[in-house]
Curated annotation (Swiss-Prot):
It comes from the Bacteria. Residues 142-162 are annotated as: Disordered. Pfam families: AAA, AAA_2, ClpB_D2-small. This is ATP-dependent protease ATPase subunit HslU. GO terms for cellular component: HslUV protease complex. ATPase subunit of a proteasome-like degradation complex; this subunit has chaperone activity. The binding of ATP and its subsequent hydrolysis by HslU are essential for unfolding of protein substrates subsequently hydrolyzed by HslV. HslU recognizes the N-terminal part of its protein substrates and unfolds these before they are guided to HslV for hydrolysis. Keywords: ATP-binding, Chaperone, Cytoplasm, Nucleotide-binding. One of its GO terms (molecular function) is proteasome-activating activity. It comes from Nitrosomonas europaea (strain ATCC 19718 / CIP 103999 / KCTC 2705 / NBRC 14298). Gene3D superfamilies: 1.10.8.60, DNA helicase RuvA subunit, C-terminal domain, P-loop containing nucleotide triphosphate hydrolases. ATP binds at I18, G60, V61, G62, K63, T64, E65, D256, E321, R393. A double ring-shaped homohexamer of HslV is capped on each side by a ring-shaped HslU homohexamer. The assembly of the HslU/HslV complex is dependent on binding of ATP.
């Protein structure tokens, strides 16, 4: 779980997302409140529930990016799902309970990776010993000596030195390793995902523990044995118990495209199923108990962050009960030309830096002048204004079109330097951006 202060969280988000200060502050406070709650004594701690957030804003302004970055900062069980994937219980499709099952699976995978990283040094030592045993099989104990001879120890140390220096990487050895588990795909009716996963687990357990001899190069054997030893050092029971508790206390669910399951009075037909999904979400967001193969999971303290563009619908089109479960509402603003300029240059992995790094692999040096960056921002902004507003995603299309010739002929231009200025931008994009029909289909 993250111990960062709200200011530190916003500072980290600022490295990747331009603007949207209100949304950043809201998610920063929500994340910090997770830590604050843990410091409160029982029984009051149990009564403090998370205040769920609804982010409203057009596409391409940073809603999903905030979720992606929050997942990395949170260091807590996190899952991002699309609301449109789910259907009302009884219809063909996934039911909303699978959100929590997926969250638990994600938490267990995260915990296992963390444990494996922690055990990596010990696992590498054990793998090294197994390789040395294969290279120098220990002498049989005949009862005459209490310990291995000094000569065999010296030989082992020589081989250990060669092994660490990589001199034996291409040598082939025969080792005993665990057999790879064959995955079995089982197709089940909707709503039976839990049963399906249990059957798959049963078949996997039947094949576990089997071992076989394999001939491998030491380079490959070291990697395989390290993974095997690291997995062996993990206590699965403790890991699962810890992951379940972590989900219940610190889990975060990001529910994207929630506006697509709203029901509008002038539209009928599919609205029945949409309302059904909303009603199925209600107990999940309010707090209920979900059965998973790792045990019962209570959702009372899981934080839900929902987002949607709400172009064709309004937040008030959600059923009133669900509206009440998202007390914090944040409106994200459309991006200005200045925002586009900042996105191109001022984030840690800005688009210009990405394209410079990509073309540098071909020996091409790309330099962008200030007026070129300003012109690119103006073009992206004006095309968004005159056609569909797709936010910052427009910059990807504009940059691809701008650098199409250089990218295609990169091998011919190798070792050269290209200066991109406003004149070059207008040559490549001027006509396209001025013609609404061309801009609509090309940019």
């Amino acid at each position: 779980m993250s111990y960062m202060t709200p200011q530190e969280i916003v500072h980290e988000l600022d490295k990747h997302i331009i603007g949207q200060d209100t949304a950043k502050r809201a998610v920063a406070i929500a994340l910090r409140n997770r830590w604050r709650r843990q410091q409160v004594d029982e029984p009051l701690r149990h009564e403090i529930t998370p205040k769920n957030i609804l982010m409203i804003g057009p596409t391409g302004v940073g809603k999903t990016e905030i979720a992606r970055r929050l997942a990395r900062l949170a260091n807590a069980p996190f899952i991002k799902i699309e609301a449109t994937k789910f259907t009302e219980v009884g219809y063909v499709g996934r039911d909303v309970d699978s959100i929590i099952r997926d969250l638990v699976e994600s938490a267990i995978k995260q915990a296992r990776e963390r444990e494996i990283r922690k055990n990596q040094p010990l696992a590498e030592d054990r793998a090294e010993e197994r390789i040395l045993d294969a290279l120098l099989p220990p002498a049989r104990d005949l009862g005459f000596e209490a310990s291995p001879s000094e000569e065999s120890n010296a030989t082992r140390q020589k081989f250990r030195k060669k092994l660490r220096e990589g001199e034996l990487d291409d040598k082939e050895i025969e080792i005993e390793v665990a057999m790879a588990q064959t995955s079995m795909e089982i197709f089940a009716p909707p709503g039976m995902e839990e049963l399906t996963s249990q059957i798959q687990g049963m078949f996997q357990n039947m094949g576990s523990g089997k071992r076989k001899m394999r001939k491998l190069r030491i380079r490959e054997a070291r990697k395989l044995l390290t993974e095997e030893e690291a997995a062996r050092l993990v206590n699965d029971e403790e890991l699962k118990l810890g992951a379940v508790q972590n989900v219940e206390q610190n889990g975060i669910v990001f529910l994207d495209e929630i506006d697509k399951i709203t029901s509008r009075s002038e539209v009928s037909g599919s609205d029945v199923s949409r309302q059904g999904v909303q009603r199925d979400l209600l107990p999940l967001v309010e707090g209920t108990t979900i059965s998973t193969k790792y045990g019962m999971i209570r959702t009372d303290h899981i934080l839900f962050i929902a987002s949607g563009a709400f172009h064709l619908a309004k937040p008030s089109d959600l059923i009133p009960e669900l509206q009440g479960r998202f007390p914090i509402r944040v409106e994200l603003e459309s991006l200005s030309a200045e925002d586009f300029k900042q996105i191109l240059t001022n984030t840690d992995a800005c688009l210009i830096r990405q394209y410079q790094a990509l073309l540098k692999t071909e020996g091409i040096e790309l330099n962008f002048s200030e007026d070129a960056i300003g012109r690119l921002a103006e073009i992206a902004f004006s095309v968004n204004e005159r056609t569909e507003n797709i936010g910052a995603r427009r910059l990807h299309t504009v940059m691809e079109k701008l650098l199409e010739d250089i990218s295609f002929n990169a091998t011919r231009y190798g070792g050269s330097t290209h200066v991109i200025d406003a004149v070059y931008v207008d040559e490549r994009l001027g006509k396209l951006s001025q013609s609404e029909d061309l801009a609509r289909y090309v940019l």
